[in-house]
């Protein structure tokens, strides 16, 4: 009964997403957020002891080997090229969970503990997050694609990075962890061109648009590929949900002149926006945001709906106002240590792992749509106010966004204009497809 209820809640959530949670920059208030979302106590879809939030219950994944079970069919070769997803956000989220369920079932044919090669991957986010679910699913895909030979152990909540989130990429580069999941914007100067995706002037409507645009931009721009290549071997780079401007306050904003004090935002365009409105940049790891907002240290927050849901930032006493426009989504990346990747190539598993990385990962990236629905639902259910900018305020914001884009282009070298133009072209194209 509990499992049936959990599945029903997910289906309610994804249907509600289509009805009330479109793109953040659409100018339409999110007046009817979903009534339900993934329960906070429920483990991620592919993590140990999870109840699979998919339309149909799935067999246990690689973390639950079954004695005497009929082996599932090995993973099929990955389809070539970028997949086509549903135009409707609710259907995309539903399909993504179904895809994860299939990966889990394929992985159940193999025992992770018997894998010949075991590697570690550090993730800043908790298990109960889109990032956690996404990475557990990728680990399942790798286990199945290598026929049980390679297992990637996902260390959520910085389990393998004692130095904290800001050290994740360096931990991977130095060989202290084999793979990493992180945000390029945490590392100022490491991959400046990749931060083009964060420009709010692009008007990214949702996670699916951001993810497809970021990945396609990376594939088409050698200058961006070169930035990442100096740090490790690329598995996948995409973008998260759009970010509202959130705060603990007592009224709606009506002008950019009211945006003052300390704002937590990532490197690149987000911090340029903070400069543009005359506020102060306040840096801290995402795990420290909850107390810093509660205690009034942070006045405003630029972070995505997924993080609002995963880190419980909509709890009473934390955030309660959400300016519903995209101040900027952030890039995500999964990379391998260069020496580790050479070892994987030597052992003959590089092609198998790459077959379930990159384009293939786009098949389940839309689980972030579900977490946006949860973030919005949490906000309203806890008494928060989600509102769009209107009139002169909307015009002021657009001017600020345009100024940020021009500054970003001027400060990022000869390739910046071409990278920005390509990113804008992709965003416009995918905005027309994925609502």
Predicted regions and their residues:
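Positively charged n-region of N-terminal signal peptides that target proteins for export
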Residues: 1-7
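Bacterial signal peptide processing site
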Residues: 22-25
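Short, solvent-exposed loop/beta-turn-alpha elements that line the ligand-binding surface or hinge
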Residues: 204-230, 391, 406, 410-413
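Sec-dependent N-terminal signal peptides
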Residues: 7-14
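N-terminal secretory/targeting leader peptides
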Residues: 81-204, 234-435
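C-terminal motif of bacterial Sec signal peptides marking the signal peptidase cleavage site
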Residues: 16-20
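Helix-enriched interaction subdomains in cytosolic or periplasmic regions
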Residues: 50-52, 64-70, 77-94
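Post-signal peptide N-terminal segment of mature Sec-exported envelope proteins
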Residues: 28-73
């Amino acid at each position: 009964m509990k499992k049936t209820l959990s599945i029903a809640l997910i289906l309610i959530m994804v249907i509600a997403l289509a009805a009330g949670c479109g793109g953040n920059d659409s100018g339409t208030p999110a007046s009817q957020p979903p009534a339900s979302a993934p329960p906070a106590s429920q483990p991620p879809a592919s993590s140990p002891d999870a109840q699979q939030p998919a339309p149909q219950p799935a067999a246990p994944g690689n973390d639950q080997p079954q004695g005497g079970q009929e082996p599932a069919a090995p993973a099929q070769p990955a389809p070539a090229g970028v997949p086509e997803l549903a135009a409707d956000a609710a259907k995309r989220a539903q399909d993504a969970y179904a895809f994860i369920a299939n990966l889990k079932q394929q992985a159940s044919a193999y025992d992770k503990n018997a894998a010949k090669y075991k590697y570690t991957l550090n993730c800043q986010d908790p298990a109960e997050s889109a990032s956690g679910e996404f990475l557990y699913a990728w680990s399942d895909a790798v286990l199945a694609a290598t026929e049980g030979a390679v297992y990637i152990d996902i260390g959520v909540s910085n389990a393998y990075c004692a130095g904290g989130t800001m050290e994740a990429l360096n931990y991977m580069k130095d060989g202290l962890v084999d793979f990493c999941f992180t945000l390029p914007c945490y590392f100022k100067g490491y991959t400046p061109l990749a931060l083009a995706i964060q420009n709010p002037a692009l008007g990214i409507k949702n996670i699916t648009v951001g993810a497809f645009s970021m990945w396609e931009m990376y594939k088409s721009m050698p200058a961006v590929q070169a930035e990442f290549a100096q740090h490790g071997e690329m598995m996948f780079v995409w973008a998260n949900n759009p970010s509202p401007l959130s705060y603990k306050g007592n009224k709606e904003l009506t002008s950019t002149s009211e945006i003052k004090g300390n704002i937590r935002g990532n490197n690149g365009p987000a911090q340029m926006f903070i400069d543009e409105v005359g506020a102060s940049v306040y840096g801290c790891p995402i795990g420290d945001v909850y107390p810093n907002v509660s205690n009034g240290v942070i006045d405003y927050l630029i972070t995505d709906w997924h993080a609002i849901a995963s880190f419980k930032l909509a709890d009473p006493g934390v955030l309660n106002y959400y300016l519903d426009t995209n101040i900027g989504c952030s890039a995500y990346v999964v990379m391998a240590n260069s020496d580790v990747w050479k070892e994987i190539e030597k052992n003959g598993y590089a092609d198998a792992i790459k077959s379930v990385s990159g384009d293939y990962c786009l098949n389940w990236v839309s689980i972030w749509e579900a977490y946006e629905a949860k973030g919005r639902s949490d906000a309203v259910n806890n008494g928060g106010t989600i509102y769009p900018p209107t009139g002169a305020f909307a015009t002021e914001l657009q001017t600020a966004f345009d100024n940020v884009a021009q500054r970003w282009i001027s400060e990022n070298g000869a390739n910046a204009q071409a990278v920005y133009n390509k990113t804008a072209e992709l965003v416009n194209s995918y905005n027309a497809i994925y609502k």
